UniProtKB/Swiss-Prot annotation:
The gene is tmcA. It catalyses: cytidine(34) in elongator tRNA(Met) + acetyl-CoA + ATP + H2O = N(4)-acetylcytidine(34) in elongator tRNA(Met) + ADP + phosphate + CoA + H(+); a cytidine in RNA + acetyl-CoA + ATP + H2O = an N(4)-acetylcytidine in RNA + ADP + phosphate + CoA + H(+); a cytidine in tRNA + acetyl-CoA + ATP + H2O = an N(4)-acetylcytidine in tRNA + ADP + phosphate + CoA + H(+); a cytidine in mRNA + acetyl-CoA + ATP + H2O = an N(4)-acetylcytidine in mRNA + ADP + phosphate + CoA + H(+). Keywords: Acyltransferase, ATP-binding, Cytoplasm, Nucleotide-binding, RNA-binding, rRNA processing, rRNA-binding, Transferase, tRNA processing, tRNA-binding. Its main location: cytoplasm. Its EC number is 2.3.1.193. The keyword Transcription regulation does not apply. PANTHER family: N-ACETYLTRANSFERASE 10, RNA CYTIDINE ACETYLTRANSFERASE. The lineage of its organism: Archaea, Methanobacteriati, Methanobacteriota, Thermococci, Thermococcales. Pfam families: GNAT_acetyltr_2 (PF13718), NAT10_TcmA_helicase (PF05127), TmcA_N (PF08351). GO terms for biological process: rRNA acetylation involved in maturation of SSU-rRNA; tRNA acetylation; tRNA wobble cytosine modification. HAMAP family: tRNA_acetyltr_TmcA. This is tRNA(Met) cytidine acetyltransferase TmcA. One of its GO terms (cellular component) is cytoplasm.
Amino acid sequence: MTIKIRFPKDVREYARKEKVKESIIKLTETSLAEAITNFHRRMIILQGDTLEKAKLAGILAGGVARILSEYIPEFLDRKLRDEDKIEVLYATDALGEDTYGRKRFEEFRKHFSVLAPNAELTSVTFKYSRDILGRTFDILVLDLSYDYSPNDLGRIIETVRGGGLIFILTNPFEKWKDMWTGFHKSLVTPPYTIDDVKKRFNRRLIRKFTEHKGIYIVDADKKKIERRPRKNKSQAKLPEREKVEIPRDIKFPRELYELCLTRGQVEVLKALEDLIENPGMVVLTADRGRGKSVSVGIASIGLAITSKKKNFRIVVTAPELENVQSLLKFAERSLKVLGYKTKTVKESGLIKEVYAKGIGIRYYPPTKGYRQKADLYIVDEAAGIHVPILHRYLEKERVVFSSTIHGYEGAGRGFSVKFLKKAKEKREYKEIHLSVPIRYAEGDPIERWLFDVLLLDAEPVELTEEDYELIRKMEVYLEEPDLDDWFENDREDLRHFVGIYVLAHYRNRPSDVALLADAPHHEARVLRLKNGKIVTAIQIAKEGGIPKAVIDKMAKGYKPPGNIIPDMMVKHHYAKEFAKLRGYRIVRIATHPDAMDLGLGSKALELLVKEAQEKGLDWVGSGFGASEELIRFWVRNGFAVVHLSPTRNPVSGEYTAIVIKPISERAKEIVKKANDEFRLRLTEWLGDTHRDLEPEIARWLFETPFGEAVNYPIHLTKVQRKRLEMFIKRVLTYDTVVDAVKPLVKLYFLDGWMRPYLDDRQIALLIHRVLQAHDWKETAKLLNRTELYTMIELRDIVRGLWYYYKHMLKDEEKDIS
């Protein structure tokens, strides 16, 4: 079916009255015709200094809404949309009274509401843009005139469906190239000023507008088209969705299959049907916008109603509640299609729980979901969740893992590399990949533009056998890349650099690229092979060198932007002198996923520390989620642990550790003291704040690169000494001598490199039973031993420690009589 794309007569007359050129109207009609015919999106940039761009957006969007509203029945019939109303989104940085953002919105609305009074207009500020997740719009007006974050760009643009238009309001490009935005102001950290902030990201964004198809540019003030389609169009051929055949042998209700828009979605429902009778695991991967979460939402309800359970509980988890909005929305819709009355619970405007008779589906953060009892566990955006947490869900009877490969939540092959490889060793599972987009058709130019500008599909360089030979010989060098060159000339090295993070365990956000591009204190380092290929990526933040006045404020509670390590040292170690010293904080370090565990990360650290030394810096440090693997990596590379956060990260489930490697003599003195203090605190924290810390992590936190014991006297009274000896001789039980054993165990962990050797299991036993005070049953389970064996082993360890350390305690004995 071919439809006419032409603004209604009254719209054209209104536009002429407002002095809108016919050529700009034709440009908009052509853009819409292209969008509908291809079921893609099109973008029109309206640049200008005045309110003219907002007025123009209001008139053009009004005309588009009127055209689209005429053909809603045809769109519904072809399953190109669900809603029977044209939905328009206006997104801006501010809507408060007397703000420029508000003035532009009012100017837009003044004209739009006259021309398209029946369209549903939603306005949102970037701060609350997550409120529109799970919704789909026909028209988007995105006001980038002052402030925006790249995260907003990725999140908002992807809400527009195929056949829709995006109007972007900007300042004149020449002005915008040199502008500082609110995002830029957030990057200023002492001792830098706004003048030090770069503008590489905006320039990249502007350049990308002109490089991709489907993007047209209008100077609103001059009423001049600067980039137009090759030829005008006044007709559009309505596209058809791919024909989806519903299998004959289905177990879920047919109504649920009728909600599917692609064969891939049907396959997801069929896969979950297999879980009705038998427990199992399904893994689902897709690029963004392929209907992955929607499919799981529909299938979960199918599983719930076909099971024989009276009350079917579904636990849904993801890094953030916003990640599962489509899933929960379609779970609710599926229930309604089947005639159920539903109840939803929302949190900050987002759906958190959906209930119907005998069915409950609820979101939990990753660290809490696996602790709940449920009949089905759904782990969405799994690549953004730390691998040890994923393994907790791996143990569940019925579990679905889904993950975005490329896109706003993407983590590339990292999910496969880090998790699925090991999962295969534990259990069988069915893997499905969805490739056909739902919201728009394949080949959408706006998706290509978005992926390009935000580097969402970046991947590292491919490695050959010759490259591995260079790695084995460690023929590598560290380099500081020219970020101006990388961003201005769109070098492949930039994609390879970001691609390493995308495929590593890091959870990437579009703003990470902008931070690297523009933050004055952020720099990149790369470890290259002799042939130039990047194998390790490092992002560093320059910290310290803080003025005394700011340091004094920090000591009283002020938190300066950036300067994470100096701020921690001032507040938690009262080391005000440290804030004057200068150093590198390693924000992110990752090695090519195909070259892991070959020593490249350690080599990169070695060369970075050498560079810092040559530049006269005082220290190199980092903050990260404290997994056993990472703590061991940093400690073995000579870094001292100086802090551990009191709470776990709700997404990764890890405590955050901060490590420092001192370079200057003054830094060595301060860091040595801080490391001693930390180790001392940890002996107490393990019985309280960090009672749930994994012993295998705790043991590495006690390690020190300085090799010396903490200078802290341990006291035992004469009676405690006697009771300790009676415990060793099997006269008294452990529970009656805890007060005497604990100081002895503390002495062991506060000792230096000369402490007696204990194996990993023995160390775990001391931490779990003595310092963390867990009972015998829990400790035996941890060690995979019987309770009796565990009791005997603890007594043997204490005997050895007592014979080794009792001479040190001799002079410290006190009598309390």
